[in-house]
C-alpha cells in the first residue's frame, strides 16, 4: 500500500476575534494527500477572507495541475488589497505526500516545516525560487512510515510576543 497520512490540525482565534486568520485545506488525489495552510494578514474577518481565498485557490489549482507559478500569479491578482496597508497578502504552505514516499513542500512566509524521523529533527533540502518577486521555498524529499511533519503559521512563532513570551516562541523551541 505504501505511505499513508494521518492529519490533525488546530486553529486558535486571536483573543477577542470571532474568526481565525488561518485556514487549512485537506485534499486527496488517487496517489497522494495534500495539506494546505494559509494565514491571512492581520486577524479576524480580513485575515479569514484572505486565508480562505488563498487555500481554496491553491487547492483548486493544484488539484487541476496548475504550476506553482500559475498559483502564485493567481493569488497575487485575486486577493483584495487592504485599504490600510495597501497590500494583498497571505502566507501559505503546501505539503503533498505521495503514497510512494515522495513529498513535495512549498512554503511562502510561513515558519519552516518541522520534520521529525525516529525522534530526530531532520533537515529538508530546499530550493529557493523567486516568483513575482516573492521568495518561495520549495522542497522535494522522501518520507517513510513513522515520520512526522508539522506545518505552522507565523501566529505560532509570534504567540505571546510582549506578554507571556517576550520574543515569541522560537522555531527551535517548538521543534525541540
Model-derived regions, located:
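Membrane-embedded alpha-helical signal segments
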Residues: 28-31, 35, 46
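Beta-strand-turn-beta hairpins that frame and shape the catalytic cleft
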Residues: 3-6, 29-32, 99-102, 144-147
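Residue-level marker for buried hydrophobic side chains located in beta-strands
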Residues: 36, 107, 149-151
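Catalytic core of PPM/PP2C metal-dependent serine/threonine phosphatase domains
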Residues: 20, 49-119, 129-130, 136
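Acidic loop->beta-strand submotif enriched in PP2C/PPM serine/threonine phosphatases
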Residues: 17-30, 123-161
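Regulatory cytosolic signal-relay segments
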Residues: 1-18
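Active-site-proximal, acidic helix/loop segment immediately C-terminal to a metal-coordinating Asp/Glu
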Residues: 43-64, 148-176
